[in-house]
Amino acid sequence: MNKILCVASLALMIAGCADPSGQSKNNGYEGLVITEVAANSDKPMTDSWVEILNTSPREISLAGLGIYLFDEHSKGEEITILDDVVVGPESRIVLTTEDMTLVKGISSSADFEIVLGTSADKGIVDRFARNRDAAAVSTHKYGSYQRIPEKGGDWVVTSRSTRRIVNYDAKPNAIWVWSTHMDQWIADDFAVMKQMKDLGYDHILLNYNAFDDWSKAGKALEIIEKAKELGVKVHAWMQVFCENKTWVNPIEDLGGGEGRYKQELFDRIIAKANKYIDDFDVDGVHLDYIRFSGSGKNVAANNSYSNGVNASGAINEFCRQLRKSLDSRPEGVVVSAAMMTGSDVLHYYGQDPEQMGKYIDIFMPMVYKYYTSYSYNNAWMKTTCANFTGVSKAQVWAGIQTYKYETGVSGEIGMTPDEVLADAEVIRNTACSGLVLFRYALGSYPDLNTFWNEEN
């Protein structure tokens, strides 16, 4: 059974236990802790770094301290010198191979330990060991090892680093929210948002119209400001290859059997994603309609050209460019994608999870069980999830419904919390690590606070 617990900045967590043995308590460095380690020397074009937090109310000079590395090649080698570094009260510093404040990289692919102390074995202020503290798990290219909470908490493995910002636990439970429901979320001092937070829903996928419609943008800002106060992550729910409610082909037919990817379309969508981050400070972007329409001439397989341009290539290239753009920003922006389910998704829609997973942090397959004329069974739900788990380093949060259909009854029927929970428990018995409910204002919602901690 899956035992993955939660996401920090929308991040994958696997709890480990810190071992403070050997740490010095009276050396003038009390209050210093290692809060985050990005061990990336085994990953191309990616820096290693270590974040140190001063939890005390006073300024601390790091003169006399060093960071010492133990791995298969180094046996207590000092990899930085901290003589000229001073850390202010309740402040943090990052030592990185990028600026050579960390003179040697660290690899997460094998066991290692770093020690913050006056030497490798004396005056130890803090330490982190991969196998002991993080269950021998390596990190994603964009992830890190984080201590949560920062002041003496357990170490966890995350899919997104939080360099220079606070580490905190966000549960891997999300809900899709339309812009038309923002008034309900704001009313009565954000009573709905507080209720959803109390039930364990730490992520909101807020529809793009909340940001694009100038008459709604102010409400979106209110929601995001309150969400940050409550510890809730807001993701901009974008419609990628869909403009003005119409699907847009990302490939132009040049004639003669050749095609080209519409770079102008890619640029426009990527600029919009960056605008959501700049103007609204969203925590992530959620890609919907990152696919072909799947019907008629717009079946993905019908868009393949002799010069190598094809449907899955268009999707993968867009994801690559978006990832590159967002990784150039200082924020840890999470990228998730709504994924189609069913047979032959690559043929009809062009989505290739193995390739997309190089650039996407979280897959959110729409594991929708209920339709107007039929329903899938639990075995189908498990098989569908298995099509996404294990094919890449992307996390998989399954999208499930909060409504169903019944013969002789018109329209959707909202499900009870127990009914939604029953479907969620099917997901928990897969390798998925999170849930996304579709959608707010249909049905009721179970308490998921301890859902990923429980035995089933």
Please report, for each region that a protein language model flagged, where it lies by residue.
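Active-site-adjacent "subsite" loops/lids of carbohydrate-active enzymes
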Residues: D183-A187, K219-E225, K233-F280, I413, ...
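Solvent-exposed beta-edge/loop recognition patches
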Residues: M45, K75-D154
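A structural motif detector for short, solvent-exposed N-terminal "entry" segments of globular domains
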Residues: P20-E72, G105-S108, A135-H140, V166-Y168
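Substrate-binding cleft/loops of secretory-pathway carbohydrate-active enzymes
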Residues: V334-T372, T407-I413
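Aromatic-lined carbohydrate-recognition surfaces of secreted/lumenal glycan-active proteins
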Residues: I175-T180, H235-Q239, H286, I290, ...
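Aromatic-lined substrate-binding rim segments of carbohydrate-active enzymes
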Residues: V192, H203-E243, N302-R329
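Substrate-binding cleft of secreted/luminal carbohydrate-active enzymes
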Residues: P365-N378, K382, A394-N456
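Catalytic domains of carbohydrate-active enzymes, especially glycoside hydrolases
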Residues: A187-D212, D279-G284, M356, I362, ...
